[in-house]
């Protein structure tokens, strides 16, 4: 790939950013996931992070990125409502992959939030958005700021939902580079990688879960359901982490 003056890209106008990102992404689409990660580490600054929900297929991204950058900070935004199996999975992968794990939480405890606001996840789309702002978006923003992150990795894939179908490999979100090396991978690609490196799926996959989140907004898949309908009562797919100006909404990982 040609060299790009990416240090200056964040200072350019929105139109200039769009044009240059389109050129870069055309090149990145031709690379393998491993090559994309290496390119990002060589071109997107010096301070990186990997955001992980430790969901169904999270072992792939964690293994892929830490193979190239073993000490990269792994950011988990812990709502306090994850499944017990998710917390056990976090412990398992942290030990096995020697993860440099950083756990960020809302500044107000879950019990205090319920006392103040009630069960926000039962209050329609607006309640879910507020819940996500408090428990996902603000902690992630704080993590990126405190770790001085120049670019962060995420395991989003186009195949996962309609809201992700047109996402590029490289984007700028809220003034920080966001990099999606698995964006064009299929479920079969994921399975092959897990098998190749003897990596586990999340344990609840075997019980019918396709996507993992909080206990109160995650459902098992049933015949006729899309993957999107297993999260947030089908009202939303995203949790907030993957939207521009996400603090004003609250939508995904």
Swiss-Prot record:
Localization, UniProt: Cytoplasm
Biological processes per GO annotation: hydrogen sulfide biosynthetic process; sulfate assimilation, phosphoadenylyl sulfate reduction by phosphoadenylyl-sulfate reductase (thioredoxin)
The EC number(s) this enzyme carries: 1.8.4.8
GO molecular function (one): phosphoadenylyl-sulfate reductase (thioredoxin) activity
This protein's GO CC annotations: cytoplasm
Keywords for this protein: Cytoplasm, Oxidoreductase
Catalysis: reaction(s): [thioredoxin]-disulfide + sulfite + adenosine 3',5'-bisphosphate + 2 H(+) = [thioredoxin]-dithiol + 3'-phosphoadenylyl sulfate
Top enzyme category: oxidoreductase
Coiled coil segments of this chain: none
Active site, per annotation: 239 (nucleophile)
Main location: cytoplasm
Record pathway: Sulfur metabolism; hydrogen sulfide biosynthesis; sulfite from sulfate: step 3/3
InterPro entries per UniProt: PAPS/APS_Rdtase (IPR004511), PAPS_reduct_dom (IPR002500), PAPS_reductase_CysH (IPR011800), Rossmann-like_a/b/a_fold (IPR014729)
Function: Catalyzes the formation of sulfite from phosphoadenosine 5'-phosphosulfate (PAPS) using thioredoxin as an electron donor.
Family: Belongs to the PAPS reductase family. CysH subfamily.
The protein's name in its UniProt record: Phosphoadenosine 5'-phosphosulfate reductase
Provenance organism: Photobacterium profundum (strain SS9)
